[in-house]
Swiss-Prot record:
<dbReference type="GO" id="GO:0015850">
    <property type="term" value="P:organic hydroxy compound transport"/>
</dbReference>
<keyword id="KW-0812">Transmembrane</keyword>
<dbReference type="InterPro" id="IPR036259">
    <property type="entry name" value="MFS_trans_sf"/>
</dbReference>
<feature type="transmembrane region" description="Helical">
    <location>
        <begin position="177"/>
        <end position="197"/>
    </location>
</feature>
<dbReference type="GO" id="GO:0015695">
    <property type="term" value="P:organic cation transport"/>
</dbReference>
<dbReference type="GO" id="GO:0032098">
    <property type="term" value="P:regulation of appetite"/>
</dbReference>
<dbReference type="GO" id="GO:0015844">
    <property type="term" value="P:monoamine transport"/>
</dbReference>
<dbReference type="GO" id="GO:1990748">
    <property type="term" value="P:cellular detoxification"/>
</dbReference>
<feature type="transmembrane region" description="Helical">
    <location>
        <begin position="463"/>
        <end position="483"/>
    </location>
</feature>
<feature type="transmembrane region" description="Helical">
    <location>
        <begin position="236"/>
        <end position="256"/>
    </location>
</feature>
<dbReference type="GO" id="GO:0031966">
    <property type="term" value="C:mitochondrial membrane"/>
</dbReference>
<dbReference type="GO" id="GO:0016323">
    <property type="term" value="C:basolateral plasma membrane"/>
</dbReference>
<dbReference type="GO" id="GO:0006837">
    <property type="term" value="P:serotonin transport"/>
</dbReference>
<feature type="glycosylation site" description="N-linked (GlcNAc...) asparagine">
    <location>
        <position position="72"/>
    </location>
</feature>
<feature type="transmembrane region" description="Helical">
    <location>
        <begin position="376"/>
        <end position="396"/>
    </location>
</feature>
<dbReference type="GO" id="GO:0005330">
    <property type="term" value="F:dopamine:sodium symporter activity"/>
</dbReference>
<feature type="glycosylation site" description="N-linked (GlcNAc...) asparagine">
    <location>
        <position position="317"/>
    </location>
</feature>
Length: 551
């Protein structure tokens, strides 16, 4: 009985049918990027903020103060460098105790010796000066509530983590396409609710749900794309689909610039997902999944459609097709750590996923804290990511996996450390070094997808990659707290943490086995032999392309 891969070769492994489906599903990567990094614009800090007391409110109305005058006359001098974004006060002058005669004056500080009034903490009635409204001004996420901005991104990543396990399981049980469509619908609906959330609690709850559905849509589209093409094309399509994620990062600042409110940005992030529901009529269910669920006839119908569109013919000999037993096995968590080599690979890969997420998200969100043109800086940082995919394609088949993987992490780590200590008087050098760091961590993020799938045997590949990549979402939960809370102490402190993490990761990945030119391991025993020189010598004669289909 022929296997699915044999039938796919007859129908065409990457013909017109697959290219059309591939292009359509790649657009999901664009919208997922909007969701993944949208907090930079949704939660951008206002230019200035302060709070009003009862007396200041009356004076502002009677004296017709401008916002700048109110800022200067009712709040203490702020000793913050002018180039820092988001200047604000967490205290105000206590003006309520002034005498009656001073109430007639439009200079409330004149009643105090040395024009120095007592200070009290702000308790509400916040005022903002900003060019675009954000969730910070909508929900007063400043001063004592500043940590709640960190929470919004952490909750989104918690949704990603929940979606990876719940919808990942659902996609294996009920089908890739149905879960993809439900996820796209969920992203749209929850996104609209987020845009019109009446309070912060509703905002956070539905942002979590949008994260669940967003991860489900991204994960299942990735799987459908890689399961419908031949094994030789999986490595390339796995990298190219991530380039569409980068395309989303490049497009997002343009949307944010021309959209005056955070609600508009949120709708722009969410509404395109409804268009993906039209894929019901053009994107098929994964035939490979259908076979594992003993629906071979439906899989054959799809393969005949593929063959017809590709200008090929699937002969009557392919009346039944099957998959290998490994593709329907039931793995266990213990299998990932039971043996020495598997244990080493699992722990290092988990750390690599965690580091990639923390450093990547940290560098992206940091753009919202530093000075300069946020929109242009974000756009340029997205452009920087594009060469990363090209460098990966050029190096991994020549230099192997370990060296580019380690080098990209070390470049990212060293760049972060150097940027932290460069003087601000040479911005061009800081920008250049920071750009190298962004390029390095982007490459590391993309390579870990590939290496993870190569190092696990067929019996554990789906489960193992899903479990390890869960550390990516956990890193995303940690990243905003790590960035914003440490930046409040010293703006460059997060860069030092990022630099240490990435540098350590670069050293650890050199301990992984090299898999260039090595056949994909089929069993745990194959993985245990990867470190032996005998297998490496055999591997030079036997080359197999790598599947990244289940990230």
């Amino acid at each position: 009985m022929p296997t699915f891969d044999q039938a796919l070769r007859k129908a065409g492994e990457f013909g017109r049918f697959q290219r059309r489906v591939f292009l359509l599903l790649c657009l999901t990567g664009v919208t997922f990027a909007f969701l993944f990094v949208g907090v930079v614009f949704l939660g951008s800090q206002p230019d200035y903020y302060w709070c009003r007391g009862p007396r200041a409110t009356a004076l502002a109305e009677r004296c017709a103060w401008s916002p700048e005058e109110e800022w200067n006359l009712t709040t203490p001098e702020l000793h913050v460098p002018a180039e820092r974004r988001g200047q604000g006060h967490c205290h105000r002058y206590l003006l309520e105790d002034t005498n009656t005669s001073s109430e007639l004056s439009c200079d409330p500080l004149a009643a105090f010796p040395n024009r120095s009034a007592p200070l009290v903490p702000c308790s509400g009635d916040w005022r903002y000066v900003e060019t675009h409204s954000t969730i910070v001004s909508q929900f007063d996420l400043v001063c004592g509530n500043a940590w709640m901005l960190d929470l919004t991104q952490a909750i989104l990543n918690l949704g990603f983590l929940a979606g990876a396990f719940t919808l990942g399981y659902a996609a294996d049980r009920y089908g890739r396409l149905i879960v993809y469509l439900i996820s796209c619908f969920g992203v749209g609906i929850t996104g609209v609710v987020v845009a019109f959330a009446p309070n912060f609690s509703v905002f956070v709850i539905f942002r979590f749900l949008q994260g669940v559905f967003g991860k489900g849509a991204w994960m299942t589209c990735f799987v459908i794309v890689t399961e419908i093409v031949g094994s030789k094309q999986r490595r390339i399509v796995g990298i190219v689909i991530q380039m569409f994620f980068t395309l989303g990062i490049i497009i997002l600042p343009g949307i944010a610039y021309f959209t005056p409110s955070w609600q508009g940005i949120q709708l722009a992030i969410s509404l395109p997902s409804f268009l993906f529901l039209l894929y019901y009529w053009v994107v098929p269910e994964s035939p490979r999944w259908l076979i594992t669920r003993k629906q071979g006839e439906k899989a054959l119908q799809i393969l005949r459609r593929v063959a017809k569109c590709n200008g090929k013919h699937l002969s009557s000999n392919y009346s039944e097709i099957t998959v290998t037993d490994e593709e329907v096995s039931n793995p266990s968590c213990l299998d990932l750590v039971r043996t020495p080599q598997m244990r080493k690979c699992t722990l290092i890969l988990m750390f690599a996923w965690f580091t990639s997420a923390v450093v990547y998200q940290g560098l992206v969100m940091r753009l919202g804290l530093i000075g300069g043109n946020l929109y242009m800086d974000f756009f340029i940082s997205g452009l920087v990511e594009l060469p990363g995919a090209l460098l990966i394609l050029l190096t991994i088949e020549r230099l192997g996996r370990r060296l580019p993987f380690a080098a990209s992490n070390i470049v990212a780590g060293v760049s972060c450390l150097v940027t932290a200590f460069l003087p601000e008087g040479i911005p061009w050098l800081r920008t250049t070094v920071a750009t190298l760091g962004r390029l390095g961590i982007t490459m590391a993020f993309e390579i870990v997808y590939l290496v993870n799938s190569e190092l696990y045997p067929t019996t554990l590949r789906n489960f193992g990659v899903s479990l390890c990549s869960g550390l990516c979402d956990f890193g995303g939960i940690i990243a905003p707290f790590l960035l914003f809370r440490l930046a409040a102490i010293w703006l460059e402190l997060p860069l030092i943490i990022f630099g240490i993490l990435a540098s350590v990761c670069g050293g650890l990945v050199m301990l992984l086995p090299e898999t260039k030119g090595i056949a994909l391991p089929e069993t745990v025993e194959d993985v245990e032999k990867l470190g032996s020189s005998q297998l490496h010598q055999c591997g030079r004669k036997k080359k197999t392309q790598v599947s990244t289909s289940n990230v």
